[in-house]
Amino acid sequence: MVRAGAVGTHLPTSSLDIFGDLRKMNKRQLYYQVLNFAMIVSSALMIWKGLIVLTGSESPIVVVLSGSMEPAFHRGDLLFLTNFREDPIRAGEIVVFKVEGRDIPIVHRVIKVHEKDNGDIKFLTKGDNNEVDDRGLYKEGQNWLEKKDVVGRARGFLPYVGMVTIIMNDYPKFKYALLAVMGAYVLLKRES
């Protein structure tokens, strides 16, 4: 059963109607919708790769996953990063870094910087809301971070926008349902 909508649209009332709509499409319409979906996915990937090149960061957008940086950033804030190698690292700067043996990058503030005569830089980080520095988070035997450990430096943020990502990771069924709805929408959307 299909409810009436705006001119040129229709709204399926059950998940079975979605499959019925797919069966009603001729091959040409189905290929067009699949191609449309593929173009959306490839456009998103091209935009992401373009951001990587423009920002110099392997991950130009990250979500704050804990409260360790409060009050500066809260859980769910979306951070925009850059990572230009020629920019010096300074105390007070907020960096995102990876630690060997951990999959998820950490967002913390640089509290100490040591620069050697040969130009090598080592630095120490700490979460604003943490009591102690991050030496306990670094790999065993590592007391300082180096520039190679930095994924990016925070240049801007959107508050709480990343909560969607956190919810999707905490509730995988929600993530798959959302992806299925979006995929069905793209496949079933008809040009008017």
Swiss-Prot record:
Catalytic residues as annotated in Swiss-Prot or TrEMBL: 68 (charge relay system), 108 (charge relay system), 134 (charge relay system)
Positions on the Cytoplasmic side per record topology: 1-28
Cell compartments where the protein resides: Endoplasmic reticulum membrane
PROSITE patterns, A to Z: SPASE_I_1, SPASE_I_3
InterPro entries: LexA/Signal_pep-like_sf, Pept_S26A_signal_pept_1_CS, Pept_S26A_signal_pept_1_Ser-AS, Peptidase_S24_S26A/B/C, Peptidase_S26, Peptidase_S26B
Entry keywords, A to Z: Endoplasmic reticulum, Hydrolase, Membrane, Protease, Signal-anchor, Transmembrane, Transmembrane helix
Residue intervals passing through the bilayer: 29-48
Intrachain S-S bonds: none
A GO CC term attached to the entry: signal peptidase complex
Primary localization: endoplasmic reticulum
PTM comment, free text: May undergo processing at the N-terminus.
NCBIfam families per the UniProt record, alphabetical: sigpep_I_arch
Main function: Catalytic component of the signal peptidase complex (SPC) which catalyzes the cleavage of N-terminal signal sequences from nascent proteins as they are translocated into the lumen of the endoplasmic reticulum. Specifically cleaves N-terminal signal peptides that contain a hydrophobic alpha-helix (h-region) shorter than 18-20 amino acids.
Name used for this protein in its record: Signal peptidase complex catalytic subunit SEC11C
